Protein backbone atom coordinates (compact mmCIF):
# COMPACT_ATOMS: atom_id res chain seq x y z
CA UNK A 1 0.00 0.00 0.00
CA UNK A 2 1.56 3.36 -0.99
CA UNK A 3 2.23 5.89 1.75
CA UNK A 4 0.33 9.11 1.25
CA UNK A 5 2.11 12.46 1.27
CA UNK A 6 -0.02 13.54 4.21
CA UNK A 7 1.05 10.50 6.24
CA UNK A 8 4.73 11.01 5.35
CA UNK A 9 4.52 14.70 6.26
CA UNK A 10 2.90 13.81 9.57
CA UNK A 11 5.69 11.36 10.43
CA UNK A 12 8.36 13.97 9.61
CA UNK A 13 6.43 16.63 11.54
CA UNK A 14 6.39 14.38 14.63
CA UNK A 15 9.97 13.09 14.37
CA UNK A 16 11.84 16.37 13.81
CA UNK A 17 10.74 18.01 17.10
CA UNK A 18 11.31 14.74 18.97
CA UNK A 19 14.88 14.38 17.69
CA UNK A 20 15.63 18.06 18.23
CA UNK A 21 14.19 17.87 21.73
CA UNK A 22 16.26 14.82 22.58
CA UNK A 23 19.44 16.53 21.35
CA UNK A 24 18.75 19.70 23.33
CA UNK A 25 17.90 17.64 26.41
CA UNK A 26 21.21 15.79 26.14
CA UNK A 27 23.09 19.07 25.73
CA UNK A 28 21.33 20.55 28.77
CA UNK A 29 22.64 17.84 31.09
CA UNK A 30 26.13 17.40 29.69
CA UNK A 31 28.62 16.17 32.33
CA UNK A 32 30.23 19.03 34.21
CA UNK A 33 27.51 21.52 33.30
CA UNK A 34 25.90 23.50 36.14
CA UNK A 35 22.61 21.73 35.49
CA UNK A 36 24.18 18.27 35.70
CA UNK A 37 25.74 19.15 39.05
CA UNK A 38 22.28 19.85 40.52
CA UNK A 39 20.61 16.66 39.30
CA UNK A 40 20.08 13.96 41.92
CA UNK A 41 22.11 10.80 41.63
CA UNK A 42 20.20 7.62 42.37
CA UNK A 43 21.82 4.43 43.55
CA UNK A 44 20.27 0.98 43.68
CA UNK A 45 20.10 -0.50 47.17
CA UNK A 46 20.08 -4.27 46.62
CA UNK A 47 19.21 -4.86 50.28
CA UNK A 48 15.89 -2.99 50.11
CA UNK A 49 13.38 -4.25 50.59
CA UNK A 50 14.81 -6.95 52.79
CA UNK A 51 13.36 -10.42 52.63
CA UNK A 52 9.64 -10.10 53.27
CA UNK A 53 8.15 -11.96 56.25
CA UNK A 54 5.91 -15.03 56.02
CA UNK A 55 7.56 -16.28 52.80
CA UNK A 56 5.78 -13.46 50.95
CA UNK A 57 6.73 -12.36 47.47
CA UNK A 58 5.50 -9.44 45.38
CA UNK A 59 3.75 -9.62 42.04
CA UNK A 60 3.84 -6.82 39.49
CA UNK A 61 4.38 -3.59 41.41
CA UNK A 62 1.67 -1.22 40.20
CA UNK A 63 2.29 1.81 42.40
CA UNK A 64 4.76 3.40 44.83
CA UNK A 65 4.38 6.41 47.09
CA UNK A 66 6.78 7.92 49.64
CA UNK A 67 4.96 9.72 52.46
CA UNK A 68 6.16 12.62 54.63
CA UNK A 69 7.86 10.17 57.05
CA UNK A 70 9.84 8.61 54.20
CA UNK A 71 7.72 5.47 54.46
CA UNK A 72 7.35 3.60 51.20
CA UNK A 73 3.82 2.52 50.28
CA UNK A 74 3.62 -0.27 47.70
CA UNK A 75 0.66 -1.67 45.83
CA UNK A 76 1.26 -4.81 43.82
CA UNK A 77 -0.83 -7.26 41.86
CA UNK A 78 -0.84 -10.67 43.58
CA UNK A 79 -2.83 -12.14 40.69
CA UNK A 80 0.21 -11.66 38.42
CA UNK A 81 2.10 -14.37 40.31
CA UNK A 82 2.17 -17.82 38.73
CA UNK A 83 1.37 -21.04 40.63
CA UNK A 84 5.07 -21.94 40.38
CA UNK A 85 6.02 -18.66 42.11
CA UNK A 86 3.53 -19.17 44.95
CA UNK A 87 3.81 -22.92 45.20
CA UNK A 88 3.05 -23.03 48.93
CA UNK A 89 -0.22 -21.12 48.44
CA UNK A 90 -1.80 -23.33 45.77
CA UNK A 91 -4.12 -26.17 46.71
CA UNK A 92 -2.56 -28.68 47.09
CA UNK A 93 0.84 -27.06 47.70
CA UNK A 94 3.48 -27.80 45.09
CA UNK A 95 6.41 -26.24 46.98
CA UNK A 96 7.52 -25.14 50.45
CA UNK A 97 7.58 -21.49 49.38
CA UNK A 98 6.05 -18.91 48.68
CA UNK A 99 2.87 -16.90 49.35
CA UNK A 100 1.62 -13.70 47.71
CA UNK A 101 2.05 -10.67 49.96
CA UNK A 102 -1.09 -8.65 50.72
CA UNK A 103 -1.72 -6.07 47.97
CA UNK A 104 -0.75 -2.99 50.07
CA UNK A 105 2.46 -2.76 52.10
CA UNK A 106 3.97 0.06 54.16
CA UNK A 107 7.74 -0.07 54.72
CA UNK A 108 9.84 2.17 56.96
CA UNK A 109 13.03 3.87 55.65
CA UNK A 110 15.04 0.75 56.57
CA UNK A 111 12.73 -1.50 54.53
CA UNK A 112 10.96 -3.08 57.50
CA UNK A 113 7.35 -4.01 56.76
CA UNK A 114 5.10 -2.03 59.12
CA UNK A 115 1.61 -2.71 57.80
CA UNK A 116 -0.06 -4.81 55.15
CA UNK A 117 -3.64 -5.02 54.00
CA UNK A 118 -5.88 -5.26 50.98
CA UNK A 119 -8.04 -7.80 49.28
CA UNK A 120 -11.75 -8.55 49.53
CA UNK A 121 -13.65 -7.09 52.47
CA UNK A 122 -17.07 -6.14 53.75
CA UNK A 123 -18.68 -3.13 52.10
CA UNK A 124 -16.42 -2.83 49.06
CA UNK A 125 -15.29 -4.66 45.94
CA UNK A 126 -11.53 -5.23 45.80
CA UNK A 127 -9.65 -5.07 42.52
CA UNK A 128 -8.37 -7.88 40.34
CA UNK A 129 -5.79 -5.54 38.78
CA UNK A 130 -4.50 -3.11 41.39
CA UNK A 131 -3.04 0.12 40.01
CA UNK A 132 -1.81 3.23 41.79
CA UNK A 133 -1.42 4.29 45.41
CA UNK A 134 -1.43 7.77 46.92
CA UNK A 135 -1.50 9.25 50.44
CA UNK A 136 -3.32 12.54 50.76
CA UNK A 137 -2.63 15.47 53.12
CA UNK A 138 -4.98 13.94 55.72
CA UNK A 139 -3.14 10.61 55.68
CA UNK A 140 -5.77 8.65 53.77
CA UNK A 141 -4.61 6.01 51.30
CA UNK A 142 -6.12 6.07 47.82
CA UNK A 143 -5.91 3.01 45.56
CA UNK A 144 -7.18 2.22 42.09
CA UNK A 145 -7.49 -0.40 39.42
CA UNK A 146 -6.58 -0.47 35.76
CA UNK A 147 -9.74 -2.38 34.82
CA UNK A 148 -12.30 -2.28 37.65
CA UNK A 149 -13.64 1.25 37.06
CA UNK A 150 -13.34 2.53 40.64
CA UNK A 151 -11.05 4.22 43.17
CA UNK A 152 -11.13 3.54 46.90
CA UNK A 153 -10.07 5.53 49.95
CA UNK A 154 -8.79 3.75 53.08
CA UNK A 155 -7.30 4.58 56.46
CA UNK A 156 -3.64 3.66 56.80
CA UNK A 157 -4.74 0.49 58.60
CA UNK A 158 -6.85 -0.57 55.63
CA UNK A 159 -10.33 0.42 56.82
CA UNK A 160 -12.53 1.25 53.83
CA UNK A 161 -13.79 4.85 53.83
CA UNK A 162 -15.10 5.61 50.33
CA UNK A 163 -15.54 4.22 46.83
CA UNK A 164 -15.67 6.50 43.78
CA UNK A 165 -17.05 4.88 40.64
CA UNK A 166 -19.05 1.71 40.16
CA UNK A 167 -17.03 -1.51 40.22
CA UNK A 168 -17.30 -3.33 36.91
CA UNK A 169 -19.42 -0.67 35.18
CA UNK A 170 -18.20 1.33 32.18
CA UNK A 171 -19.86 2.06 28.85
CA UNK A 172 -16.73 2.92 26.88
CA UNK A 173 -14.36 5.83 26.47
CA UNK A 174 -17.14 8.38 25.97
CA UNK A 175 -19.00 7.44 29.17
CA UNK A 176 -19.24 10.64 31.26
CA UNK A 177 -20.75 8.89 34.27
CA UNK A 178 -18.27 6.09 34.99
CA UNK A 179 -14.54 5.68 35.39
CA UNK A 180 -12.61 3.68 32.82
CA UNK A 181 -9.36 2.56 34.42
CA UNK A 182 -8.12 5.07 36.99
CA UNK A 183 -4.34 5.17 36.79
CA UNK A 184 -3.40 7.77 39.41
CA UNK A 185 -4.84 10.33 41.81
CA UNK A 186 -4.05 13.57 43.59
CA UNK A 187 -5.92 15.36 46.37
CA UNK A 188 -5.54 19.15 46.41
CA UNK A 189 -4.98 20.13 50.08
CA UNK A 190 -6.54 23.61 49.75
CA UNK A 191 -9.88 22.34 48.44
CA UNK A 192 -9.78 18.66 49.48
CA UNK A 193 -10.76 17.76 45.90
CA UNK A 194 -9.49 14.61 44.25
CA UNK A 195 -8.20 14.60 40.68
CA UNK A 196 -8.28 11.19 38.99
CA UNK A 197 -6.22 10.35 35.90
CA UNK A 198 -8.58 7.98 34.12
CA UNK A 199 -5.89 6.52 31.92
CA UNK A 200 -7.17 3.09 30.95
CA UNK A 201 -10.35 2.60 28.97
Annotate each PLM feature.
Residues 8-21:
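Bacterial N-terminal signal peptides
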Residues 6-7, 48:
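Hydrophobic alpha-helical segments and their boundary regions
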Residues 23-201:
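Eukaryotic scaffold repeat domains enriched in small/polar residues
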Residues 1-5:
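N-terminal secretory signal peptides that target proteins for export/translocation
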Amino acid sequence: MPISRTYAALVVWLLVPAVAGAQSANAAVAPGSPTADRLPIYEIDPTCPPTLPNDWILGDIRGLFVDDRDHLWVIHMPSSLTPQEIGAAVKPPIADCCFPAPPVLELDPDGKVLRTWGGPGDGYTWYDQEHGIYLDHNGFVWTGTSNGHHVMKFTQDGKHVLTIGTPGVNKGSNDPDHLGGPANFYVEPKTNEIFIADGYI
